[in-house]
Design a protein with these regions (language model features):
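Bacterial N-terminal signal peptides
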Residues: 4-15
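Sequence/structural signature of beta-propeller domains
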Residues: 17-218
Length: 218
């Protein structure tokens, strides 16, 4: 006989805003590999530790595209609405993720220091941390920006010279993934642009120079 249960945690997160601002409230629900067997932890080579489903009635929340977790457990995420979400991950004594605290959600800034507006200009998809700041890739209006410092939401973006071929990507199938490699090079892949059938277009940036690379999909 199986017992199905869920743990619902409501966490009130106070954002850095005036006292009259509405608190950012999350509902956090534990998720499992198998809702009928919560002890199932391994699927093939994958070991599942823990997971949560996060919702909020705040209209700014949602559409998380990519995230980075600092060694101290602080999460920095970007959304397809051009927001940066920061929150502290909460773990129980067994090391399972159970909640979020200290949340803040703020619009990213353009190179002119203005907050992003409009879906086509705000669809952030890829995020990667470097020793000097953050690279963020965008769809629709295809581009990569750099945000110096420890928080991408408090500084104006810096434009990055893009690789050739960005205009060939579908509006909603652009630079979906972005990562800085251990040697400092920047790697990015398109979601839908193909060089050949089952061969996804990507680019590798060394210094300020881009080169084409391709990922074959089986």
């Amino acid at each position: 006989m199986y017992f199905v249960f869920s743990v619902l945690i409501t966490v009130t997160l106070l954002i850095s805003a005036p006292a009259y601002a509405k608190p950012l409230t999350f509902s956090v629900e534990q998720v499992f590999v198998d809702e009928d067997n919560h002890d199932l932890r391994r699927v093939g080579e994958l070991e599942f530790i823990s997971g949560i489903s996060v919702t909020s009635d705040n209209k700014r929340f949602g559409g998380l595209s990519d995230l980075h977790v600092n060694p101290d457990g602080q999460m920095i995420a970007i959304t397809d609405k051009g927001n940066r979400l920061a929150a502290q991950l909460v773990f129980d004594r067994h090391g399972s993720l159970v909640g979020l605290t200290n949340g803040d959600i703020t619009k990213l800034q353009t190179p002119k220091g203005k907050k992003l507006k409009g879906k086509k200009k705000s669809d952030a998809e890829g995020l990667t941390r470097t020793k000097d700041g953050w690279f963020v890739s965008f769809e629709h209006k295809q581009r990569i920006w750099f945000f110096p410092g420890t928080d991408p939401a408090v500084v104006a973006a810096t434009k990055i010279s893009p690789p050739k071929g960005l205009k060939d990507m579908p509006a909603n199938g652009g630079l979906e993934s972005l990562v800085e490699l251990v040697d400092g090079r920047l790697l990015t892949f398109s979601e839908d642009l193909e060089n050949a059938p089952s061969q996804t277009q990507g680019w590798l940036r060394t210094g300020k120079a881009w080169e084409n690379i391709y990922l074959s999909r089986s």
